[in-house]
Design a protein with these regions (language model features):
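Active-site-proximal loop/hinge segments that shape catalytic or ion-binding/gating pockets
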Residues: 249-252
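FMN-binding flavodoxin-like domain, especially the glycine-rich phosphate-binding loop
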Residues: 2, 6-33, 42-52, 56-177, ...
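Generic structural motif recognizing short loop/turn segments at the entrances and edges of beta-strands
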Residues: 22-23, 184-186, 214
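Short acidic active-site motifs
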Residues: 36-38
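A mid-sequence, solvent-exposed acidic-amphipathic segment
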Residues: 164-196, 202
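Iron-sulfur cluster-binding cysteine motifs and their immediate structural context
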Residues: 189-190, 195-217, 223, 227-244
Length: 253
């Protein structure tokens, strides 16, 4: 069973590759939260996976919230792993996730990171990758995920996460500030280029966008995944002045 969260599609692509190879069921975390489905029954030979993007050098708050409520019936120390997608590095994501899992009495046997195209654009200096780098990351991700699949099939116990520089500062100091101050949807708006196509509404993984007339309106249950911004065909979705002249990215697969 593979639990996953994805906004712009990088982690969804990874989760799909793992599900096909491991023949494990996929569970989209926002759907489980919406339906309040927190209890899952495990086979004795089940592989349990968590797949998610890195948000400010840690797992997204929505993933940690789900784990707190999750109940795994029939858990007998089955092989449990995680795979995270990141634009550059993961910080102390492994520590954060292992702590959340240990509070449930679950052991994490393996963890991996996959470098994927950047999509965070809400801070100065942050933008999507240039097209050449984007294409290289997507190409390199294929053999990386193949290797991860092979390790999972062998139930290997190993952690291959690229922590990067100053991981403590990034995860323990910057991430809490991100969760406190950068999760608000209040600055989202659409320019006159909006054509009312509803793609932003349909792409929101938590159903936080409603169309009022022909314009999207954001609620307060935002994960800051930026799917709405990146999926807009008119580049009409903006976030204050922070997204001016910045690019868009949505996983092509």
């Amino acid at each position: 069973m593979i639990f996953y969260f994805s906004g712009t599609g990088n982690s969804k692509w990874i989760a799909n590759q793992l599900s096909k190879e491991q023949k494990e069921e996929l569970v989209f975390i926002p759907d489980a939260l919406k339906d309040r489905t927190f209890e899952f029954c495990l086979r004795e030979d089940e592989k349990i996976g968590f797949v998610f993007p890195i948000y400010s050098w840690a797992p997204p708050a929505i993933v940690l919230n789900f784990i707190r409520q999750l109940s795994l019936k029939g858990y007998k120390r089955q092989y449990l792993f995680f795979v995270c997608s990141c634009g550059d590095d993961t910080g102390l994501t492994q520590q954060v996730l292992e702590k959340a899992l240990s509070h449930k009495g679950w052991k994490c046997y393996a963890g991996f990171s996959v470098t994927m195209p950047n999509n965070y654009v809400l801070l100065p200096g942050f933008d999507v990758d240039k097209k050449e780098l984007e294409e290289k990351k997507l190409a390199d991700a294929i053999p990386t995920v193949n290797q991860i699949n092979a390790s999972i099939s062998r139930r290997e116990e190993l952690f291959l996460c690229h922590e990067g520089s100053i991981p403590f500062i990034k995860t323990r100091i910057i991430n809490p500030l991100f969760n406190r101050f950068q999760m608000s949807p209040e600055n989202f708006y659409t320019t006159d280029a909006c054509i009312g196509c509803k793609r932003c509404e349909k792409s929101c993984p938590v159903g936080n966008i409603m169309m009022v007339g022909r314009k999207p309106v954001w609620g307060m249950d935002c994960t800051s995944c930026l799917a709405c911004y990146h999926v807009c065909p008119q580049h009409a979705v903006q976030y204050g002045k922070r997204t001016k002249d910045k690019g868009q990215y949505f996983n092509p697969n």
